[in-house]
Amino acid sequence: STDYVFDGSKDGGYTEDDAPNPQSVYGKTKLAGEAALITSGARHLTFRTSWVFGAHGANFAKTMLRLAAERRSLKVVADQFGAPTSAALIADVTAQVLGQYIQSRRATSAEFPYGLYHLVAAGRTSWHEYARAVVQAAHLANKPLKLGPDDVQAITTAEYPLPAPRPANSCLDTTRLRETFGLCLPDWRQGLDHVMTQLLTS
């Protein structure tokens, strides 16, 4: 699921117990999916995540890398915050949790901690700082670009209107996930460094 089930008005990270209030059709459909799964009575694990990126498919990091090679300046929103989360981290955590499920052999037991969890990388940043980090990594790898990190300009959400509103705060608290399954989630920069290495050497 997604951070878009929240309206983004909270200070600090959202927990699984915070009341959802989606502001877009996308967020509403994700929340409806969560509710349908719960009401079905099926044992389940639902992971809410945010700002997903990877070496494959369309995502913010790849878009910034492409635009940095085409333009001499970029304007990126600086008043929306979250944790860029790599697809690899989501896959790894999912595999670890399912591995614990299999090893515990509690497939038919109510004791296994099924339910809703927040799964994002550690740390917090803005879209603007995220974009600067992408450009900086490309520069360090000697990728030919038309701009540098200082050419990535900060703007407000009001200066970049979109048809569907995005939460100003997409930070998700992962305490429940980490404590329940004994996980240590890496900082978002670690995942970005790995993906940038893939993109810049391919």
Where are the model-predicted features located?
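Catalytic helix-loop patch of NAD(P)-dependent Rossmann-fold dehydrogenases
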Residues: 4-47, 51-52
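Residue-level signal for the nucleotide or nucleotide-sugar donor/cofactor binding architecture
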Residues: 24, 82-85, 125, 172, ...
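NAD(P)-dependent short-chain dehydrogenase/reductase
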Residues: 36-96
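Hydrophobic "lid"/C-terminal helical patch
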Residues: 64, 94-98, 134, 192-199
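Mid/C-terminal beta-alpha module of Rossmann-like enzyme folds, strongest
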Residues: 93-94, 100-161
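Active-site loop of classical SDR/Rossmann-like NAD(P)-dependent oxidoreductases
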Residues: 153-174, 187
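Amphipathic terminal alpha-helices
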Residues: 176-178, 187-202
